């Protein structure tokens, strides 16, 4: 079996790690960074950029640069959160035929898992470059509070990227694994506060150690899948837009280019204000009107930023209370607090968390890397490389079916350890009813319509009988990824229907297969593009080298050969402008053939240089008379 890698697929940044010996190691990408921006761009010349290269060109290509896609994964277009994002994202969010929230770039509609797959492909390639072998399996992390549809969509993204997703693991649980793996000395109860780019989770986890074997048991989890650093950025962006409007009377929201520049500046200002008390948002030529160009120069203090986001930080504290209550613990029973996710670097967030728990969060956990490291540990457990670690995770939300009167009847309660199985016997609501619809729900409300619909299916062929007589056994089987499999069986006839819940929205098997094939086709076209670029570079080098040699050969090169070479160079220059690698290769060979005489002359000249008494030797003799001197640099006092 090949290596299994651990991937933290984040809203703002992603990270990949692998077990290197018995220690997890975060792998640097091609740009030398330990994290990769979760940004995907589709350029005018058909290239797909991921990470920093995509981020760099965002200002000039805002409509086709996609970021924070994780906020859309597994979501319906009509969802309130999607409608909020619709107003602030510079790219198009569109409604798919199945009701999902998709995106549009360069006139093409794409599912969120398709875009996320591009980020996963980059992570896969990063790992392959480091390991020197193909990688086909991964453990991918998701927010603990992700529902079934969002987990399924993340798995789909993995498949599209060419990865077998061995396990979906909750981010706070992964962070706890990273933290607790090498900690010695007794049992601990830890709180993992995870405020990332787009999602927020809190998990209460108990770490027990018995005879060297560690058990990580999640006691409870809670969160908000639409609260994160992006929301903090948006508050600052809105403030800057309003301030500029007051000063200049112009609304920048109508200018996608200006908004993209503003997004970058706001993110930078927010980061700076974690260490400084004040910063300037200085954007010259942000826009223009009939009177000329307009510039933005607005001072932002840390206090101002804190006043803009105070309610968001406060919002993150509510799930803490619920999680503690669900775990049956008081604040004083928490031994350690771990904060992960980039947004936890904000001093105000750290202060509020410390105030809530009555103690400072630990500083020995890297908030950007802990989740990927934990995923790599779990990958090691699955591969059999890490022994003595048992992970017991939970389902974040209750699961059940709709019963008479639009009530949700729960079969699996929230915070139940997974994998788990539950069954319950139901019956018909009317006489001689021959079919029942099983409507599967996820959530905590009694009224079905307020919960998340995960899908429905029919059990047909029920024997005619008075209402309440048939016995229909519904079984919920929740796997270790937190993905649900449901079956319904008529106990009298033995007829059975089974489904793996694939939200009525989610991607069908056909869709995924098509996207996998597209990704494979793109792999081929990417390879061809790379080969074309290599051929062009070789052509450039040959042209440059040949011209230099022609110059050096001077009169020694017959005029007839010189003409042949110049013609071949011109033809190669023309060929390299086109998209045909074979044509470039052919013209390279033609230039090499035309340069035979030139090569001979160059060789003769080189030999003459090396010969005794030649120029090279004379220079060497002169060099013998050179005396090495030591110089001391004199500093200019005025500087």
UniProtKB/Swiss-Prot annotation:
HAMAP family: DnaK (MF_00332)
Biased amino acid composition, Acidic residues: 625-639
Keywords: ATP-binding, Chaperone, Nucleotide-binding, Phosphoprotein, Stress response
Induction notes from the record: By stress conditions e.g. heat shock.
Gene: dnaK1
Protein name: Chaperone protein DnaK 1
Residue ranges, compositional bias (Low complexity): 603-612
Region (Disordered): 603-639
Residues that bear Phosphothreonine: 199
A molecular-function term among this protein's GO annotations: unfolded protein binding
Pfam families: HSP70 (PF00012)
Stated family: Belongs to the heat shock protein 70 family.
Organism (species): Photobacterium profundum (strain SS9)
Disulfide bond positions: none
